[in-house]
């Protein structure tokens, strides 16, 4: 079994835990591989399949008498099948469709493996710590790669691997929120150091979306945590800290150069004069969203076909490799209203179950992932995540939080095939 405690990663070996240890190593390797070798073909596919194979070893080791199929696996399989079938009415048949399909199959493998691994609350706690550890390694790798003189220039997160800094910063935000949960709900004071480190990384990444989430996440978590003593004092304290973070970003020269000026330009773009000279990326993202809306209007029910947003933009507007920067409009333009309803149906189910666990059963873990899911929906107005691997790992962990609180584990969350008993 792999554990991360007091800043030390430990591997405890025993005959009973061999399969579990193999899976936990595969989980960490997969996260690091997707970051460090983002541009290497098929390596992400390999590590995703290894996660599934390792979870199968774990399932066999449990000597389970029933075949269990997680609901979130059925959901994403249905969404993947519908996405693939969109080739029948697609505006263009292109290589991107095959690439998207392969990526989505790997996502199915990864999210299924997580549902197999997480069988009780202790498993969920452990996988959260493994995720935090993985992001810590990624952050340290990036800091070690970038000279100190370059830190304030933004884009922290893209230097080591060439990955999109927005995407990396989003994943680090997830780890920051998990670390804040360990600090605030479980009283593990050392985790506040990780919260601070992750927040600094996000500031230096120049990602406005991740910065918003990294500040709003702890605030929302405290607001929802009505079970805590000194509730109103905690609200005042977290809002004060959030205000100080924003003040620091807007007044410190290095922080302002890294992200403060981008925040200022965004506010100018939203609330003042759009003709004023601001960050050109804001204009382009608004333009791409408008194009996605036009495509949806042309084919509202079925969409233009998986991967066709970029292809149509390339053929019609000669803009290569673009996306809408909005998960809602990306899905609506490519897969129509049917694809949109299939995809977000699981979000709805997860949020409802987490809300029930958080407010009725008083589960702090459910409160954590309810906060994450709410912010994910908000952030997807500026991110495209429906076929991204790492965000779906966190969504799968959030789904796992909906069933581990039950005394009998998966009784209510799984479809059971009893044919093996016959």
Summary of predicted features, one role per range:
Residues 28, 52-55, 368-380, 385-422:
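Transmembrane alpha-helices of multi-pass inner-membrane enzymes
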Residues 125-151, 163-227, 374:
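Alpha-helical transmembrane segments of multi-pass inner-membrane proteins
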Residues 151-161, 274-335:
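Long extracytoplasmic/lumenal interhelical loops at the membrane interface
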Residues 72-84, 93-116, 126, 130-135, ...:
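Aromatic-anchored transmembrane helix interface
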Residues 12-21, 59-74, 182-193, 226-235, ...:
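Membrane-interface helix-loop-helix junctions at transmembrane boundaries of multi-pass membrane enzymes
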Residues 204-205, 225-274, 293-298:
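A membrane-periplasm/extracellular boundary helix in multi-pass inner-membrane enzymes
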Residues 1-63, 79-91, 376-378, 393:
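N-terminal signal-anchor transmembrane segment
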Residues 61-64, 126-129, 189, 314, ...:
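Hydrophobic transmembrane alpha-helices and their immediate junctions
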